[in-house]
Amino acid sequence: MFSLIRAKRLAIGIAALAWSTGAVMASEHWPDLPVGIKNGAAARIGNMAYVGLGSAGTDFYALDLNNPSKGWVKRANFIGPATNGAAMAAAGGKIFAFSGNGKATPDAKSPIIFDTAYVYDPGSDGWSKLDTQTPVGLSGAKAVGLADGRIAIFGGYNKELFDKYLADVGAIDKDKEPEAYRNLVDSYMGMKPEAYRWNDEVLVYDPAGNNWGSLGANPFLPNCDPAMATMGEGDFLLVSGEIKPGLRTPEAKLVKIRDGAAHWQKVSDLPPLSGSEPQEGVAGAYAGKAGDDVLVAGGANFKGAQANAAAGKWFAHDGLAKSWRDDVYAFDGKDWKVAGKLPRGLAYGAAFDAPGGLLVVGGEDRDGKARKEVFLLKWDGKALSVEN
């Protein structure tokens, strides 16, 4: 995202910014987020966009998409511990936040994956803790509202393994015990993807009954922090994401939810960037519909991790530098193509369908900085441009 001091104008005329509905709004100056937000969560109800958590701590903000000149308005703080990577979705006029990771108390020695769930009511501007526990860890998962009022959730880290690993790491002084520290990290990071036991069920939460169910198993390796786009009612495209810490997949899958079950179909992989640079896959990318196509932009990976994994080196990102990607891809329902570039490498922000393109909000840059800026990736099916 551009670091701009001047106000930014998205010259898109009168159009609809569609996350889940098609609200109409006029072209306006779009305000920056009040603070940079990465690893946060976002949802929309009607014309109101909600973004927060992650690097914003317990802060939660709303923007009226029909009147963006009012700017982002501070809403009630999240009442749980500061949370990264929560799964968030809207249903029945409320916003639900599941799991995530962080310290249970400020003085806790290590983070954990939360098994809690919270609901935000815009009418009362208040949060409540739900009387339920997530069946598994859902940090890094994707949540989406369904037409029947339930919420489907894909992926998520294993709470037991994650909590134990971070507790063990936190108990070792790596300066005084470098060998023990290295052995612990090597042991955890060197496991094959299946050993991490990430959530391989399509879970479903029913707010009306406050209960959980399953739409069936994921026939592929479960992944975390994929990009996700809504293709139609009950149809979702899951793109790339991690299959274990440090290793992404270039795979994309179409999920159709019909008759109480999730039906999976593999579609084309993200394409290689060049003959000399294979596709590593990305985590934390931005995605959404742009006309008839899906755009996937940015994300982060480790160049060389795929080759290491193919050679049986399962600590695949050991010694590799993390890369924040600026690549943008377009998918026409059959094939991918490289559409262009972001202004900078970005990952772990929010993205929303917008008229003619993809609205990119917040995220993390190559310096690890949480960004505040918003811009539109405009796509006409042939050429990509940036409006800011």
From Swiss-Prot:
Cystines in this chain: none
Superkingdom in the source lineage: Bacteria
Annotated SUPFAM superfamilies: Kelch motif
Any one of the GO CC terms: periplasmic space
Leader sequence segment: 1-26
Substrates-to-products reaction catalysed: N-acetyl-alpha-neuraminate = N-acetyl-beta-neuraminate
Matches recorded under Pfam families: NANM
Location within or outside the cell: Periplasm
Kelch repeats: 48-92, 94-147, 149-186, 187-232, 236-285, 307-356, 358-387
Residues annotated as the enzyme's active site: E242 (proton acceptor)
Enzyme Commission (EC) number: 5.1.3.24
Keyword Ubl conjugation: no
Keyword Transcription: no
Keywords attached to this entry: Carbohydrate metabolism, Isomerase, Kelch repeat, Periplasm, Repeat, Signal
GO molecular function: racemase and epimerase activity, acting on carbohydrates and derivatives
Record note on quaternary structure: Homodimer.
Family: Belongs to the NanM family.
Function according to Swiss-Prot or TrEMBL: Converts alpha-N-acetylneuranimic acid (Neu5Ac) to the beta-anomer, accelerating the equilibrium between the alpha- and beta-anomers. Probably facilitates sialidase-negative bacteria to compete successfully for limited amounts of extracellular Neu5Ac, which is likely taken up in the beta-anomer. In addition, the rapid removal of sialic acid from solution might be advantageous to the bacterium to damp down host responses.
Protein name: N-acetylneuraminate epimerase
Organism annotation: Brucella abortus (strain 2308)
Gene (name only): nanM
